[in-house]
Amino acid sequence: MTFLFLILVFIIEILQLSVFPPIFGNAYIVPSLAFLLVLFSSYKIKEKALLLAFLSGLFYDAVVNFLGFISLLNVVFTYLYLVLNNILFVKNPKVEVFLIMPLILLLRKLTIFLVVNTKFPLNIGLKDFGVVLLIDLIFLILLYKVFNKYVYEKA
């Protein structure tokens, strides 16, 4: 099952890195579709999602040549999500999917943006950043519909 998720994450990573950089002008601020899939896969494959996050980030780092920073962020924020899900036991799974997960996504996206912006001055407007977050939210809703059974099974 982990290998299947790994292949799916790589396919989504390739698609997101081939579709969104021409639209937004760079490969650093793209929607976090593969990272969202890693977070949702944690409902099915549990702690193996950390390995999946690392490999996904490593692939992204190889494409944008950012020296392992994205893979480190993926692992840190996936671990933070897993810890928050285990510590904050919520009766309603929609709270963790629509409150904790977007918060983790926003923190990761802001961290990437701030670190990349110090290394390479990016010309990203608030509108582009908002569009990327909106795409993330739409994909979050779609993945919630797909993984609905596993989310409620955990609760």
UniProtKB/Swiss-Prot annotation:
Record flagged with keyword Transmembrane helix: yes
Topological type in the membrane: Multi-pass membrane protein
One Gene Ontology CC term in the entry: plasma membrane
Transmembrane segments: 2-24, 62-84, 97-116, 131-148
UniProt keywords, alphabetically: Cell membrane, Membrane, Transmembrane, Transmembrane helix
Compartments reported by the entry: Cell membrane
Disulfide bonds: none
Protein name: Uncharacterized protein aq_1188
Taxonomic source organism: Aquifex aeolicus (strain VF5)
Biological classification of the source: Bacteria, Pseudomonadati, Aquificota, Aquificia, Aquificales
